[in-house]
From Swiss-Prot:
It is found in: Nucleus, Nucleolus; Nucleus, Nucleoplasm; Mitochondrion. The keyword Nuclease applies. The keyword Cytoplasm does not apply. Residues 1-104 are annotated as: N-domain. GO terms for cellular component: mitochondrion; nucleolus; nucleoplasm. This is Flap endonuclease 1. Mg(2+) 1 binds at D34, D86, E158, E160.
Length: 395
């Protein structure tokens, strides 16, 4: 799930933190990818007639199809991917996982009912909600990656946290995930949409943590408190506290301790803290997640030549893929993983640090831009209100 509305908050209040671009812009870079999130998206997206792809033996192959062809696309564009798999979830995540499981059961029942009475759209919608990544899906994807010569590592708990460690250490350029909580684990750069299909034509989003903090006017501790208040995987959100309110509360009070105190002492009782809301524990999970250090031997990785015959046996003989396509893909892998060794020019130049005056000027321009946006919103709201109040037919 990640952090609710965090991308909206950053894009509206720290627009300089977000860059959009094409996948080819990341040529020559190493990227750590949240494998479990990617596999989930493959199971949802790689479908035929609303159903997951199956082998002749009735085994699901959507995850393998997605992993093979999306990884090929990444490598074709000169990127060297490293996949990171989730380990056991933190205990605090148990409540959220239980809720997801309950929602999936409800969706499964609704899907069965839609088969009898609903439309094709209803069936597709509820079918997608029943999807979950199993241990077997993970193991098959690991086998595939090994045959492709693409490295992977197993995280002790959260894959996003491990990706962030590798990015902070400079072992990869960025962490790639659709989960915005990757930023809470202090990933310097987060890439979104990297494993999307080419047909979706979604630009790659590149989110820079330092610019997000600068634009929001927060330090890392306040940013994590904001994310907890927005709603994370570890705690249920405070009812009626949306993104604008969460941002206002953190800016006004500076920390969750003071926010909670203000809410509890409010005579109007506008907001109510849930009975069991251990935000200090959630904060600790973001600050000190269970991860392997970047110099851990298990975090050593390298890209190798694909095992062509092994791929043919696994994907063609066992899973029913097209042999021509698999062999063609293996040839592209072998060629492009070598090409990706080329260095980017930026690696030879050290960026020049901005002066205090330049930073102040950038902040002033940013503040003026935000004020202008607020002014436009007020004017639009006023115009809509006047239009509604105007008698029908009046000019």
């Amino acid at each position: 799930m990640g952090i609710k509305h965090l991308y909206q908050v950053i894009s509206e209040n720290a627009p300089d933190a977000v860059k959009t671009g094409e996948i080819k812009n990341h040529f020559g870079r190493k990227v750590a990818i949240d494998a479990s999130m990617s596999i989930y998206s493959f199971l949802i997206a790689v479908r035929s007639d609303g159903q997951q792809l199956m082998s002749e033996a009735g085994e699901t192959t959507s995850h393998l199809m997605g992993m093979f062809y999306r990884t090929l696309r990444i490598v074709d564009n000169g990127i060297k991917p490293l996949y990171v798999f989730d380990g056991a979830p933190p205990k605090m995540k148990g409540g959220e996982l239980a809720k997801r499981s309950a929602r999936k059961r409800e969706a499964h029942e609704a899907h069965e009912e839609a088969k009898e009475t609903g439309t094709a759209e209803d069936m597709e919608k509820f079918s997608r909600r029943t999807v979950r990544v199993t241990r077997e899906h993970n193991e098959e994807c690991k086998k595939l990656l090994k045959l492709m010569g693409v490295p992977y590592i197993d995280a002790p708990t959260e894959a996003e946290a491990q990706c962030a460690v590798l990015a902070r250490a400079g072992k990869v350029y960025a962490a790639a995930s659709e989960d915005m909580d990757t930023l809470c684990f202090e990933a310097p750069i987060l890439l979104r949409h990297l494993t999307f299909s080419e047909q979706r034509k979604e630009p790659i989003l590149e989110i820079h943590l330092d610019k997000a903090l600068e634009g929001l006017g927060m330090d890392m501790a306040q940013f994590i408190d904001l994310c907890i208040l927005l709603g994370c995987d570890y705690l249920e959100p405070i009812p009626k506290v949306g993104p604008n309110t969460a941002l206002k509360l953190i800016r006004e009070h500076g920390s969750l301790e003071k926010v909670v105190e203000a809410i509890e002492n409010d005579p109007k009782k506008k907001y109510v803290i849930p009975d069991d809301w251990p935000y200090q524990e959630a904060r600790e999970l973001f600050f000190n997640p269970d991860v392997r250090k970047a110099d851990d031997p298990q975090c050593d990785f390298k890209w190798e030549s694909p095992d062509v015959e092994g791929l043919v046996k696994f994907l063609v003989t066992d899973k029913g893929f097209s042999e021509d396509r698999v062999r063609n893909g293996a040839a592209r892998l072998a060629k492009n993983l070598k090409t990706a060794q080329q260095s980017r020019l930026e690696g030879f130049f050290k960026p020049v640090a901005k002066t205090d005056a330049e930073k102040a000027s950038m902040k002033r321009k940013h503040d003026e831009k935000i004020e202008e946006q607020k002014k436009r919103k007020k004017e639009d709201a006023k115009a809509k209100k006047e239009a509604k109040a105007r008698p029908r037919g009046a000019v």
